[in-house]
Amino acid sequence: MQSERQKYIRNFSIVAHIDHGKSTLADRLIEATGTLTEREMDTQVLDNMDLEKERGITIKSQAVRLIYKRDTGEEYTLNLIDTPGHVDFNYEVSRSLAACEGAILVVDATQGIQAQTLANCYLALDNDLEIVPVINKIDLPSARPEEVKQEIEDVIGIEAEDAPLVSAKTGLNIKDALEAIVNKVPAPDGDEKAPLKALIFDSYYDSYKGVVCHIRVKEGAIKEGTEIKLMNTGKVYEVVEVGVFVPNYMPVDELKAGDVGYVTASIKNVRDARVGDTITEAKRSANEALSGYRPAVPMVFSGIYPVDGAKYEELKEALEKLQVNDAALSFEPETSIALGFGFRCGFLGLLHMDIIQERLEREFNLDIITTAPSVIYKITKTDGTLIELTNPTNMPSPSEIKLMEEPIVKSSIITPSDYVGAVMDLAQNRRGIFKDMQYLDTTRVSLNYEIPLNEIIYDFFDALKSRTRGYASFDYELIGYKDADLVKLDILLNADVVDALSMIVPRERAYAKGRNMAQKLKEIIPRQMFEIPIQAAVGAKIIARETIKAMRKDVLAKCYGGDISRKRKLLEKQKEGKKRMRQVGSVEVPQEAFMAVLKTEE
């Protein structure tokens, strides 16, 4: 059932691979519909965080309402929902897509289809969206729009003959894109009289309004004063304000089925208004929630410690503030003998981890040390209990472990065919299992591998880029767990275990990794007045050793000639002193040492 009002609404999002010009296209659409005056136009209007603008990526989903007047005089309300493009934020993308009826697939005319173009496109198809291909960057001399159209038809299988050819940078043919949205994206439907059902596709904390939920009303209507209930948490709130984004907040009287807007209800914490949850009325609630909700599950863990131990409380407050805005971030206190008090934090992926670290340093001015990232291992102990291990230091002794499993991801790598050998070589080095490969066209190949998450967690992406001169693109999703023969590698300095350097590695690689780490640390740790042995150990067995030689004073400088026994006495005395020093001396480990451990030798 569709009302007259709904016929003039279009809800759509823009999906693309990183850097194909998604946020710039959004800017042009905002400009072309006159949503903001020229003075207010700022590049990448929808990327609010400084970090987003700097890295040129979108991290949080955003929404904006555009009013488009056709030449025929009809007025359409277009709700644009801008989504993050990075694989770490896949769940957020899928929720944003669930709020739409259509998606603009932006493809770079010079690059063609890349791994995330496909991944995001399939996400859109899973949500039954109408896909409108738009080919961008046609002002570049290397653009090849006709070939790219053909590629879209062959690889994705959607009609692309009349895809608008635009340049988001110069604003060329933007009107064609707007017309395509109106003509191809279906109008929303949904009964305005039915009980309220609204999907939260983003939520964040505002210091004045509390938590602001971005919602898409699927059925019913919501207005100020309505008592609402969140279906997954069962909590009840009273609506304080509803409105739409122009990109700034503009309060309205009510939002009805088909509308996209925001609602505030003095909710204190983002965790209570999870992305993907369903809002309904407390008095007249819907029978079932909208499908597809799942809590955010962290995949990568890392320890974060303040360089200055006194800043522990500040770090805790900073993490709490970030968590208010980022439901996917989890943290719990932990202590390390080497680093003192800190937190074990869980992230969606590496980019997410990187961004959180950068925000801690930038927005909160904290100096932090981060330990090597690790994943969740599942361990079945000999007595039958199952534990999940996120920190290598807590690994039980080998005699207690019956079975150990590690997470496996399904990864798709799209690369120019010249580099297939290099990519396969890299994937095999990282314990990848080859699944299949298909040629997308004469020059590009898609390779599918199953790789342990542990192997791609740190620098797989960098290695892939350097082997393919930056041409390959990569996308992954977790598919499950598989048993593996893993051991814990410890590093001992001066015979003390440095817990923050411990890591879990496959048994057959332990020796090489231990040797490598010992050599790296030898280069990085500064010389002391006494000799420092660096040892790598698996259990009680030492598998590699390097020694940092002591600095020594020339005690014989003042002896000119003379008796050998006098010299011997001085040397013996020096030796004794060094021995004593070594018993009481402690070794300072510089921050670079923690970083060096992560860099694996290719």
UniProtKB/Swiss-Prot annotation:
A cellular-component GO term for this protein: plasma membrane
Localization, UniProt: Cell membrane
InterPro entries: EF-4, EFG_III/V, EFG_V-like, EFTu-like_2, G_TR_CS, LepA_C_sf, LepA_CTD, LepA_IV
GO biological process, one term: positive regulation of translation
Binding positions (GTP): D19, H20, G21, K22, S23, T24, N136, K137, I138, D139
NCBIfam families, sorted: lepA (TIGR01393), small_GTP (TIGR00231)
Protein's name in the database: Elongation factor 4
Taxonomic source organism: Clostridium botulinum (strain Hall / ATCC 3502 / NCTC 13319 / Type A)
Native organism taxonomy: Bacteria, Bacillati, Bacillota, Clostridia, Eubacteriales
Gene, per the UniProt record: lepA
